[in-house]
Amino acid sequence: MNNIVPIAPSRGKVPESEKVTINLGFVDLGHIDLLVSEGFYANRTDFIRTAIRNQLTAQNDAVRQVVARKMLVLGLQRFGRAELEAVLAAGETLEIRVLGLASIDDDVPPALAQTTIASVRVLGAFHASAAVKAALAGRMH
């Protein structure tokens, strides 16, 4: 099985972020609003993004070790019809392991994805058509 596939060239606009909804206690939210009103942060989103970045920086060494141990691709990995047809022609299958965004282009038929992708493990976001996601449902971890 082939574990590493080169990142395909961009075929369109890829979203730069994924929306996340969180529930906060009223007191925590009040503290955030106080810091925003005092000019420490531009808005709530700025505070939350800064807090997340600070935590990720604090845990950076542990994250790097896990990424290496689990052989994860860091960032964006896209798969198009041509790439998957080449995998099929070579008689291989892929184990997709991504920390970031894994994207399967809309031109990929579900049967091709099912034949060429052995497993999918994404820490972050996975973008694919509903039909491709359904075809890979039993292989997603």
Where do the language-model regions lie?
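Short, positively charged interaction helices/loops
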Residues: 57-91
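Short, basic amphipathic alpha-helical segments that act as recognition/interaction helices
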Residues: 2-13, 30-31, 42-66
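Extracellular beta-strand scaffolds
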Residues: 78, 83-85, 102, 108-110, ...
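Short amphipathic alpha-helix starts
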Residues: 17-34
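Short helix-capping/hinge SLiMs at alpha-helix to coil transitions
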Residues: 38-39
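Detector for repetitive beta-architecture
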Residues: 71, 76, 95, 101, ...
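Compositionally biased, non-globular sequence tracts
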Residues: 136-141
